[in-house]
Amino acid sequence: MRKRTFLGASLALGLGGFSGLVAPSTQAKPAGSKSFHGRGEILWDTYGVPHVYGKDEAAVFYGFGYAQAQNHGNIVVHLYGEARGRAAEYWGPQFADSDRWMLSNDVPARALAWYRASTPQFRQNLDAFAAGINAYDAANPGKIDPKVAVVLPVSGVDVMAHAHRLMNFIYVAPMERTMGAPVPGAGNNGSNAWAVAPSKSQSGHTMLLANPHLPWPTSYFTYFEADLNGPGIKMYGATQVGLPVLRFCFNDHMGFTNTVNSMLGATNYELKLSGDGYLFDGKVLPFKTRTTSFKIRQPDGALKTETLTIRESVHGPAFTRADGKTLALRVAGLDRPDGLKQYWDMGMSKNFAEFETILKRLQVPTFNIVYADKAGHIQYMDNGVLPKHPKGDLAYWRGDVPGDTSATLWTDVHSYDELPKVIDPATGWIQNTNDPPWVATYPQVIHAENFPPYVAPPGPESLRSQQSAHLLADPSKISFDDFVARKLSTHTLMADRVLPDLIAAAQGDPDPEVQAAVNLLKAWNRETVADSKAALLFETWANRFSPGNFTSLANYKVKWLPSDPIGTPKGVADPAKALDMLKAAIGEMKTKYGAIDRPFGEVSRFAIDKVDLPGNGGFGNTGIFRTITWGPLKDGKRIPVHGETWVSLVEFSTPIKAKGLMSYGNASQPGSPHRSDQLKHLSDKTLRTLWTTRAQVEQHIEGRTPF
């Protein structure tokens, strides 16, 4: 069966000139482990979830680092090597572009500066996390792939460098966007988040859903579930591998989650070159230049040294693309070293006053943040470090901005008070599925016209976001069981909007195959589940009706309307054309699947290693809340490439109730039993009880690791 693959972090883009500061030639001292003897233990439950118990804060970080190395060591250590800007030295020329990007954007050097700028306690925490990784390798020689282990030992600076790279130069300013290549996963990445207030809850308790969607191949996007405990420390949730803090987190008092937002924290400035310089406000300015070097391992194992010329304009580091354009990159938030500490403090908070005070630091450079607490408060925030601009909308600032004038050079960013947010709405609920902030609840309480046009586009609202709102907007109060059931919904909203018109258009067609298709679609309950015999047919037709990953509105009778943001688009503009699309879809179904009524789960499989189960869920842009992005057909089957990853649903009762799932399992190391052991839940549309207390954990122990 399929194995989980590694999503390459470097693309061959033919990078030209580079700019930035030279990386330090030495790494920080590797983190040791002797001082942690007798300071804690890890209880491993039967799903491979580490429950870390430390005698102090640093010991908790140490245990968390050890646990990540045990379950995901190959990925974590590889990512740290990439963040050093030395991946080509370790693994060859396919990583040279990545190294150039790291060095040109000063990631290794800035990581060292950020590490030094951290509080003494948080530096200890970073060192402890790294020490845990090193300790796992020392205690288990050979478990981490020797080709990857060349990076070891790691240090607290490596931890900071990876976080800096991930946040600022993958999420905020990915290499591909500057260099003119498609950003990997840009059309699919997403998440779901809900918060329900006591007024909307049947029990009178607040509820929170965390449900990120990211690629399934192992990479910096892979999630890891953990339970962290110590004096004054109690937090449960998930994070991306290599990070020492939880990004999706709850405790007994509150919880928060993230979704990717459209906030644009980086600008590409197109430079007009003149001689050896560039034009700026009518003058020719020289580039600041310097050189550094890095090593590239050759196929025979020899190391070749490459000299890197680094150029910098008034905007930032300059790059020459394959199309001949020279662009300078300006990234907001590079003066904010405490993003990791902010996440840690968010997880340590006990109430909304504490949480909001922490949010106001604006150290986390991007992401929507959705919050809920036991006292009944809920919040949505379009969070990030957002540059202030005098004009222009999001599309303008996402493009190549003229760099020959100071009129476009931003120098300030928006404050917390200036960013869109919804706090304790009268509706009693909040949602976000990566769409603009304006329908965080409905009826709307914030509006695009009250914010600069570069904050977020006014619309359209995606069908997944509309379905999310519909799942919460009915007048009934929601029990926890109903909360779970709504989250597991596989209903296809797009079918509600267009199937009546399509069926009407096809009803009188004399072709018996068309009538067979009509009968399938009429009988379909519009659920994308394993035994559905019409879901694949509808998906195949919908891909023609709404091309561009199901985003085109051209064939709808009624386009998306700001006045009806969760009721449009709808209808079929040209019934005859839609019928032709159905006939083409019938032919495609017969060619690809052998019949027009293949059960969805025969073709769509949840398969990792030797586990191969019927799938459910589908493309978010068809209005399915349970998002699974299916990969290309291979040997008559397809598997997820993106979608449902970490899920947690929490009711802040006494004690709290928590359900969850890590779709692809909580480990990626070869031979781990936890690489695929949760796929059965995913296939059955069920969730696990999350064991949040020591008493619960003790009943489900698979192993103990004292330290």
Regions found by a protein language model. Name each.
Residues M1-G14:
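N-terminal secretory signal peptides and thylakoid transit peptides that target proteins
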Residues G14-L15, Q363:
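Residue-level detector of secondary-structure transition/capping positions
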Residues L21-P30:
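Signal peptide processing junction and immediate N-terminal pro/mature segment
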Residues K29-P510, A523-F707:
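C-terminal/peripheral segments of proteins
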